[in-house]
Regions:
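Short, ordered coil/turn segments that flank beta-strands lining enzyme active or ligand-binding pockets
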Residues: 5, 20
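Short secondary-structure junctions
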Residues: 6-15
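Conserved C-terminal structural/oligomerization subdomain of aldehyde/semialdehyde dehydrogenase
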Residues: 17, 24-141
Length: 141
């Protein structure tokens, strides 16, 4: 899809054959993309990364938030000012600074914002509250 819209498949993306049946692909890196392209407008669950060139931090934050989805967002920076601002203003359920955007500790809530979220947060106390039915019972023996 990205290549049909003039994105460049820099590496990966080929289907892999494995002993176990399934749909496996090599991690793909796609460059020369724009915010309007499908690769950047749809939620892709696979080992795919696309690159959108921006001129500065403000444009990067605007591009990151210009999506109907918001599972996770991340920034790589040496600027404490940008790191702090990004954590507060990125419209995502999980925000990482100088870390991968996948994976969180089991004790913290997991979930997205906007169209990336469905139902309550998984993991952490939010999950405990959702999956637990509280009952108070008394017995006089």
């Amino acid at each position: 899809v990205a290549q049909a819209e003039c994105g460049t498949l820099l590496c990966g993306g080929q289907r892999l054959q494995r002993e176990t049946e399934g749909y496996y692909m090599a991690p793909a890196l796609i460059t020369d993309t724009t915010p309007a392209m499908r690769i950047n407008r749809e939620e892709v669950f696979g080992p795919v990364a696309s690159v959108i060139r921006v001129k500065d931090y403000d444009e990067a934050l605007a591009v990151a938030n210009d999506t109907p989805f918001g599972l996770s967002a991340g920034i790589a920076t040496t600027s404490l000012k940008h790191a702090t601002h990004f954590k507060r203003h990125a419209q995502a359920g999980m925000v990482m600074v100088n870390l991968p955007t996948a994976g969180v500790d089991y004790h913290v809530p997991f979930g997205g914002r906007k169209a990336s979220s469905y139902g309550p947060r998984e993991q952490g106390r939010y999950a405990q509250e959702f999956f637990t039915t509280v009952k108070t019972a008394y017995t006089l023996a």
